[in-house]
Amino acid sequence: MSGVSIKGKTSGFGTAPVFFTAIATILGAILFLRFGFAIGTLGFWGGIMIIILAHLVTIPTALAISELATNKRVEGGGEYFIISRSFGLNIGATIGFALFFSQAISIAFYVIAFTEAFEPFFNWVQTRYDVILPRQVISVPVMLLLSLLLILRGANIGIKALYAVVSLLGVSLVLFFAGSTDYSTTTGFTLGNAQFRNTDDFFYVFAIVFPAFTGMTAGVGLSGDLKNPARSIPMGTIGATLIGMIVYVFIIYKLTVSASPEDLVNNQLIMSKIAIGGAIIIPLGLAASTLSSAIGSAMIAPRTLQALGGDQSFPMKRVNNFLGRGRHQDGEPQNASIVACTIAMFFVLLGNVNAVAEVISMFFLVTYGSLNLISFLNHFGSSPSYRPSFKSKWYISLIGFVVSIWVMFKINTPYALSAYLIMVIIYLIINYYHKDRKGLEAIF
């Protein structure tokens, strides 16, 4: 059975939703809450090295996705659809399940990060009433509201909200770059005296900030809702990846010249001390970026799950039919949205997904490595029907695959091994129930 293609009222999106979903996730929670810590710890050149290493993964992946997306129409499920139609449904479903859980947990990650924008409120309550409020007083209502909007209204309302919050994110970044501090007038920073310090902590810091760059494929999950995926996916994904990289380089410079290493490390909202009107605009920008990332994940995760159900990936037919079914009038993955939002709510109630964030990175890296491997293999063993209108180079895809796997083990070897072990178990279960499906031979 083919992947689910969402048709009806929600179909017909152009390139903009792909680009804005990706760029809002790239310039999201990690930028506002953790990037100052990264630059304060590693210095200017350490930050540049993070950008280079991260984009040795993301640029080849963006090119690989663009190549695969222009070979044939990408239906609902985005990355899952691409992988399953190249590696076969069993291996595709194995990676698809990992990808779905990463996307669903990401909703919770961004909702929890959203509550950090209310830090002044929590501090005021503690000072005024001597009461320490749990972050869930904000995160749970937000998660409930987000769930209701997506389940009842679908992608159209999500895209409209996305445009609004991305606009606010853009304003906050402009005011950040326009701001100045006393430190910036006395630092005397030049590229000649820029530092790369605490090199032993490089991969520890890299693990904290790398999830920001996993946002480059966020818009691909809207594939079934796009008017022309073969055009919108390459333009939106590559555009967001390259623009995000350029913006981060300028942010590294701005942070380095505007605040001392100590302030960068100790003040997680250091950008509010630099931006014009930062006490207001940076919390608003943080709220906008995290909310837009949560909206993006909440739109994409159900579409991955719907495509998995449409491909009969679960052992029980009733479950497949329930999850694969779209809303009658427009094909919206309403049932899959309920499941995705329920999983996200569970982690929101836990209140802390820092440890889970590393697992999320592992599964995203597995997905990126798989996409690069598919692109690489197709350069040497593809069928005559493999004729993408956009072509990457085989060695670029190979670099993306190797660096993805290497980075997994450098970030956290036990987590990397655990991710592979979980996926092997999932594959064995799927293969047991679907022995008739092709595996790797599907690519040749």
Tell me what each language-model feature is.
Residues 46, 135-183, 196-197, 214, ...:
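Membrane-interface loop-to-helix entry segments
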Residues 81-82, 88, 120-125, 242-295, ...:
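TM-loop-TM module centered on a large, flexible mid-protein loop between adjacent transmembrane helices
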Residues 1-78, 397-399, 432-444:
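Membrane-interface "cap" regions at the ends of multi-pass membrane proteins
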Residues 2, 7-18, 89, 133-141, ...:
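Loop-to-transmembrane helix boundary motifs in multi-pass membrane proteins
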Residues 59-144, 291-304, 349-373:
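Hydrophobic transmembrane alpha-helices that form the core helical bundles
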Residues 320-334, 368-415, 439-444:
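C-terminal membrane-solvent junction of multi-pass transporters and transport-like membrane proteins
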Residues 5, 47, 127-134, 163-283:
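Helix-loop-helix junctions that connect adjacent transmembrane segments
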Residues 34-41, 70, 94, 142-165, ...:
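Membrane-water interface regions at transmembrane-helix termini and the short interhelical loops
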